[in-house]
Amino acid sequence: MTDALIRLEQVAVTLSGQSVLDNIQLSVKPGEIVTLIGPNGAGKTTLVRAVLGLLKPDSGTVWRKPKLRVGYMPQKLHVDQTLPLSVLRFLRLVPGVDRMAAESALEEVGAEKVIDSPIQGISGGEMQRVLLARALLRKPELLVLDEPVQGVDVAGQAELYGLITRLRDRHQCGVLMVSHDLHLVMSTTDQVVCLNRHVCCSGHPEHVSHDPAFVELFGKNAQSLAIYHHHHDHAHDLHGAVVNDAPATSSHTHTHVHGDHCKHG
């Protein structure tokens, strides 16, 4: 798997004496979209932090391609309502970014009209596009998107997932995405990893949606809806740090597998 951008092998994390992640195996290749799904408390945010290098696993390894450029899009941005901050000034917090670079990134995500708007005054969908534009400013080889459609209506969610696919196609970057809605990402993602502190099952989304481990986690409606209700319990500051954090179509083919700790066939 030398062509991987990032690879996790037997990763385990314990926080406050409790196992949060156990024996995680995961990799993302260039041009591949991998989606993490799982209930609240499944360890998705912890896994993302391990991928970003913000948290060191207690055991196992996190291998990254040397000098890997990563663009990160947090779930939610916490901005003081009294802070005079335009979208342009927010994007220019990224070192080396001028107005031209900011405009170019916003055009890529279809949000160029908000460049001079106060960041507190834009809509939820516009905010997600601005956060995505900020991730693109780093010219990433790997995009890490933590709930990229958070706070967006269903129509807007489908548009954003389509945009993510187009960006993947254009830049041939790998994408690691956390999502709560397998139904909407069915045509976007190449591989789904169902997480509940360990990898319950993984593979093509259509296969995972019928897997007993997936159905057990998400209930009897899982096969038709593949959805659960996400309760967002934390936000991020301007630099992506967690505030009050709690402990496509593609030619890629994947084998549908179960995690080591699953009791499903």
From Swiss-Prot:
Superkingdom in the source lineage: Bacteria
Residues given in the record as ATP binding sites: G38, P39, N40, G41, A42, G43, K44, T45
Record localization: Cell inner membrane
One GO cellular component term: plasma membrane
A Pfam family this chain is assigned to: ABC_tran
Membrane topology of this protein: Peripheral membrane protein
Presence of the UniProt keyword Calcium in the record: no
Reactions performed catalytically: Zn(2+)(out) + ATP(in) + H2O(in) = Zn(2+)(in) + ADP(in) + phosphate(in) + H(+)(in)
Keywords: ATP-binding, Cell inner membrane, Cell membrane, Ion transport, Membrane, Nucleotide-binding, Translocase, Transport, Zinc, Zinc transport
Domain ABC transporter: 6-221
GO terms classed as biological process: response to zinc ion
Renumbered residue ranges of the record's region Disordered: 245-265
First-tier enzyme category under EC: translocase
InterPro entries found in the cross-reference section: AAA+_ATPase (IPR003593), ABC_transporter-like_ATP-bd (IPR003439), ABC_transporter-like_CS (IPR017871), Metal_Ion_Import_ABC (IPR050153), P-loop_NTPase (IPR027417)
Main localization (coarse): membrane
One GO MF term attached to the UniProt entry: ABC-type zinc transporter activity
Keyword hit for Transport: yes
EC id: 7.2.2.20
Subunit structure: The complex is composed of two ATP-binding proteins (ZnuC), two transmembrane proteins (ZnuB) and a solute-binding protein (ZnuA).
Similarity annotation: Belongs to the ABC transporter superfamily. Zinc importer (TC 3.A.1.15.5) family.
Function summary: Part of the ABC transporter complex ZnuABC involved in zinc import. Responsible for energy coupling to the transport system.
Protein name: Zinc import ATP-binding protein ZnuC
Native source organism of the sequence: Pseudomonas savastanoi pv. phaseolicola (strain 1448A / Race 6)
